Every structure is written in structure tokens, then in C-alpha cells.
Amino acid sequence: QEKKSVLLDNVKYDASDSIIIDQKQNKIILYNNAKIEYDDIVLTSGLIILDYKENIVTAGRISDINGELSQYPTFTQGGNVVNPDSIKYNFDNQKALIWNSKSEENGMNILSSLTKKQNDSVYYLKDGKVTTGGNLMGDESEEADYFFKIRKGKLVPGGNIITGFTNLFVKNVPTPIGLPFAYFPSQQTRDSGFIIPNINESNQR
């Protein structure tokens, strides 16, 4: 009971169409231009559902008058901004599941089909793309000049990305370049581009 009251006493919420408080389900449902603020967290979305018993918030898109999905979630914590299709966040342990997210870290554009937020500084990526060569769309019409396609990776915001198996794509076309792992350093002190491991370089010289 105490934990529940702490969340409700400190969270700010608003929506332009409806705010439904379901006391039986212990939920607050916000629809259309929904927004919540809690500590250093700001979440906006078409639909937000706050479970104040479990201290979990979920957010997703809504359909417009033409049946098109709109009002994608925007999750901001500190200086980190993520734009996913949907998100589920736990206020107690600060962990989150984030679907189809787009974000930017020090000049690197990052797209991930599933992201697990471990805490406010560590994210685990699955089936993602990383580039400094343009905007990532996530479909067949990629605008980026090139990108690295990753299966799994670890992101430290403001820092580095370490990945497992990685493929290089140029103009959305796969190249023969495949690496068992790759290291993408922070771009804060670099002009552009990546450093990737040169496998067996010493043996080739």
C-alpha cells in the first residue's frame, strides 16, 4: 500500500481525450496525447496504461481517423530519448521492454526490434541496425548510406556498443563483410565512422 501511494503521489499524468481510473484493476488509462512524468522520466504516447499496483506502465500507438497508427511513444530519461512502437516500464527496478525502438547516441543512429533496458545506462539490443550514415527507417526503404546489422548487442548510452555477429550493408544491400563481433565507440571524440575488429589482421600481413 505504501509503495502504491508513493507512485500515485509523485506521478503526473494527462491526456486530451480521456483519463479513466479503474480502481478494480488498479489502473489509470490515458488516451490521446497521453503523458506521464515521474522523477526524470517523461513518457508521451497515444495510449498509456499505468498499473499502480504493480508499478508498471505500458504505452503504445493509437489509430487515427484514417486507420493509420500514430502518436508513437517517446520515452525520455535524463538525456536519453527512445522512440519505439511500444514500451513496458517497471518503476521499481527501472527495467523495460521496448519494441521497434529508434534512438541516437552521440552521432550513432540505432534501431532495434527488441530492447531490454537493464537500468538507466545499459540497454541490450536484439535484431538491430547501427549507422552514422543517415536515418534508419527499419524497412526496405532504408535511407542510410550504410549500416551494420546486428543480432545481439549491448549499449551504454553516451558510451559504446559491443555486438555479436555483425553484417555490413551498403545502400541496403548486404556485403560479404561479416564479423563474429564488433565494437562501436562513442562518437563524442570522433568525426564519424566506426572501429571494427580486423580479424586475423596480423596473420595476413
List the model feature ranges, each with a label.
Residues 1-205:
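Structural signature for solvent-exposed beta-strand/loop edge elements and short helix-capping sites
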